[in-house]
From Swiss-Prot:
Effect listed in the UniProt record for changing R461A: In strain: CCUG 37602
Organism: Neisseria meningitidis serogroup B (strain ATCC BAA-335 / MC58)
Extra remark beyond the main annotation: Present in outer membrane vesicle formulations which are used as vaccines in human.
Localization (cell): Cell outer membrane
Subunit and interaction comment: Homododecamer. Tetramer of trimer.
Family: Belongs to the bacterial secretin family. PilQ subfamily.
Name by which UniProt lists this protein: Type IV pilus biogenesis and competence protein PilQ
């Protein structure tokens, strides 16, 4: 029974193929891109009519095989390998009746197909663990769709479920295009997929498979996902595929030297999705691909090398393809060109002995498909023996041998002696110039929006507003330019071609200037420590001599006739300089008293000062901000034998002066001047006067947008030890400490200056403090 059912289903595939067109064209290209949820899209391109494929899935090994009836393969590379967790390799093969694509997977998978224009999109994702249901029940439960219905609906999706395990033994014994038993469902309808499933299908397939949304619905999910993918095609071109779900507009594309910058306006990229791909090893014009966030926009930067040209396509909303091709040889260029040439024509072999040059040109025209027109001046014979040489290189060799050159217009190539072509070019240019000199003059007003009209005076090299003449290369000898500063308008009078050049120039230059927010942080930290130890002591007394009384001692004035009074004055006076805690001892003795005082001090200080000036300015425009004091100083001037006194104001400010310069690759070069001045007290002789403590920085540095750079710093450390003592007495061990004063001081100061520039968006950003 199962064998009969297998034959019936195989017959249905044959019937389906019979209803399709006898010749459906060739497969010309295969591209792979990524979707969220670990999905892949394989895009198969055709040169003619599209055929919806039939196929089957195996789990061991994990493969998806798709057959395209009455289809050939027209690709230089028929085996494509990928370093991907799901898809590892795509192999293409053909026989007389069909073409087959085999998708080798790293793990079991499932797929859906969809026809879009001249392409078939194959959506691949991982299969659930419970998908491997028995093959026989799946065959019985799957109703076969009529062949006519399949052929008449090329734009519908077809779903293929898991068939019998395709063992390696069966694979080796089977012919290259032997069909396996598959379960074919009805044409795919996302709205009716669950309702149309039978009870047996629900038992064989898990609930997850029924609830799975098709790839198209997943692509339209509201969650914004952005991803990039890179690959190389058969033309040595680098292909970058950008998937930006949720972005419905068109990207802004600009070219700056060796960079292609693609900007998605108002499409925010999460920080975790920023990435950079180094693809230089692929040997394409693309060297590096960077996806990053720029304010509220997403920016794709393609770094290139060599000569290239860009082709961009939009496959669907949110999906963009950028193809960077090596630039082909320009056949229209004439004259001497020492640059290395690249030849891409079909290889041919020629072996002639003493043959007319015209005959050789005729053969090359047939081989290349070009229409070659030779001048009457082209004549002579030559011997030529070439094997497996591109036809365009053979043509170049013939022209070099006979001093010939060519000019191409469409599919027609004119070949003549080089001098003859140069004379024609010169005559043509002279005729165009004569026509321009005799043409009518027109007047056009250009009111500038963002630039100052005076800036165009220097661009056009106009000394005054009504200057005429041909000193400027943009203006013809009969033209003139007037400038109206009141209305910011340029009035151009010249031929139509010159006015059109002015229009293009103004469109390129009259654009809003980028703005930069520059933020500086000045951090000043100080750490101080000091310790002092001092001593002072003295003695006083009174002694009676006969009938007289004489006073003696340290600390009182000696005299005669004094009373029995006691007093004390320190004669060893070595205290600490600062006010501090002290211990004083007085000891009375029979004839006087001793006084001893010990003083000690220790201090620890830590300070931190933060200054944060910031300023907003346009690109290449200087900005300045200051905050502080103006301190008056008295200045005495002496002249002609007399003197005069004046009062001058000196600034003590915290200031930031900066001029930013944005480079084409988004870096910022800044010329920075930072001042941090403050009033201070300075010693001048025996006086203390007012002075200004200054800290200045002048530098030029480059930093990336949003990056922070330390542009300067100063570190100071002062260490001091002082010792004051009484000679000789201070040197006595132990007791000598009573005749000493010690001091220790350590001060550390550090100044660091940070600077952070940020390029503001065109709409402007609010300042945040």
């Amino acid at each position: 029974m199962n064998t009969k059912l297998t034959k019936i289903i195989s017959g249905l595939f044959v019937a389906t193929a019979a209803f399709q067109t006898a010749s459906a064209g060739n497969i010309t290209d295969i591209k792979v891109s990524s979707l969220p949820n670990k999905q892949k899209i394989v895009k198969v391109s055709f040169d003619k009519e599209i055929v919806n494929p039939t196929g089957f899935v195996t789990s061991s090994p994990a493969r998806i095989a798709l057959d395209f009836e009455q289809t050939g393969i027209s690709m230089d590379q028929q085996v494509l390998e990928y370093a991907d967790p799901l898809l590892s390799k795509i192999s293409a093969a053909q026989n007389s009746s069909r073409a087959r694509l085999v998708l080798n997977l790293n793990k079991p998978g499932q797929y859906n197909t969809e026809v879009r224009g001249n392409k078939v999109w194959i959506f691949i994702n991982e299969s659930d663990d419970t998908v491997s249901a028995p093959a026989r029940p799946a065959v019985k439960a799957a109703p076969a769709a009529p062949a006519k219905q399949q052929a008449a609906a090329p734009s519908t999706k077809s779903a293929v479920s898991v068939s019998e395990p395709f063992t390696p033994a069966k694979q080796q014994a089977a012919a290259p295009f032997t069909e396996s038993v598959v379960s074919v469902s009805a044409p795919f309808s996302p709205a009716k997929q669950q309702a149309a499933a039978s009870a047996k299908q629900q038992a064989a397939a898990p609930a997850k498979q029924q609830a799975a949304a098709p790839a198209k619905q997943q692509a339209a999910a509201p969650a914004k996902q952005t991803n990039i993918d890179f690959r190389k095609d058969g033309k040595n071109a680098g292909i970058i595929e950008l998937a930006a779900l949720g972005f419905a507009g068109q990207p802004d594309i600009s070219q700056q030297h060796d960079h292609i910058i693609v900007t998605l306006k108002n499409h925010t990229l999460p920080t975790t999705l920023q990435r950079s791909l180094d693809v230089a090893d692929f040997k394409t014009p693309v060297q590096k691909v960077t996806l990053k966030r720029l304010n509220n926009d997403t920016q794709l930067i393609i770094t290139t090398a060599g000569n290239w040209e860009l082709v961009n396509k939009s496959a669907a909303p949110g999906y963009f393809t950028f193809q960077v091709l090596p630039k082909k040889q320009n056949l229209e260029s004439g004259g001497v060109n020492n640059a290395p040439k690249t030849f891409t024509g079909r290889k041919i072999s020629l072996d002639f002995q003493d043959v007319e040059i015209r005959t050789i040109l005729q053969i090359l025209a047939k081989e290349s498909g070009m229409n070659i027109v030779a001048s009457d001046s082209v004549n002579g014979k030559m011997t030529l023996s070439l094997k497996d040489v591109p036809w365009d290189q053979a043509l170049d060799l013939v022209m070099q041998a006979r001093n010939l050159d060519m000019r191409q217009q469409g599919n027609i190539v004119n070949i003549a002696p080089r001098d003859e072509l140069l004379a024609k070019d010169k005559a043509l240019l002279q005729a165009e110039k004569d026509i321009a000199d005799l043409g009518a003059l027109y007047s056009q007003n250009f009111q500038l929006k963002y630039k100052n009209v005076e800036e165009f005076r220097s661009i056009l090299r106009l000394d005054n507003a009504d200057t005429t003449g041909n000193r400027n290369t943009l203006i013809s000898g009969r033209g003139s330019v007037l400038i109206d500063p009141a209305t910011n308008t340029l009035i151009v009078t010249d031929t139509r071609s010159v006015i059109e050049k002015f229009r293009k120039l103004i469109d390129e230059l009259d654009v809003p200037a980028q703005q930069v927010m520059i933020e500086a942080r000045i951090v000043e930290a100080a750490d101080g420590f000091s310790r002092d130890l001092g001593v002072k002591f003295g003695a006083t007394g009174k002694k009676k001599l006969k009938n007289d009384t004489s006073a003696f001692g340290w600390g009182v004035n000696s005299g005669f006739g004094g009373d029995d009074k006691w007093g004390a004055e320190t004669k060893i006076n070595l205290p600490i300089t600062a006010a501090a805690n002290s211990i004083s001892l007085v000891r009375a003795i029979s004839s006087g008293a001793l006084n001893l005082e010990l003083s000690a001090s220790e201090s620890l200080s830590k300070t931190k000062t933060l200054a944060n000036p910031r300023v907003l300015t346009q690109n290449r425009k200087e900005a300045k901000i200051e905050s502080g004091y103006e301190i008056p100083f008295t200045v005495t001037s002496i002249a002609n034998g007399g003197s005069s006194t004046n009062t001058e104001l000196k600034k003590a400010v915290l200031g930031l002066t900066v001029t930013p310069n944005i480079t084409p690759d988004g870096q910022i070069i800044m010329t920075v001047k930072i001042n941090k001045d403050s009033p201070a007290q300075c010693a001048s002789g025996n006086q203390t006067i007012l002075c200004i403590s200054t800290k200045n920085l002048n530098t030029q540095a480059m930093v990336e947008n949003g990056g922070t750079l330390i542009v300067g710093g100063i570190y100071e450390e002062d260490n001091g030890n002082t010792l004051t003592k009484v000679p000789l007495l201070g040197d006595i061990p132990v007791i000598g400490n009573l005749f000493k004063t010690r001091g220790k001081k350590t001060d550390r100061r550090e100044l660091l200056i940070f600077i952070t520039p940020r390029i503001m968006g065109t709409a402007g950003n609010s300042l945040r403090y």
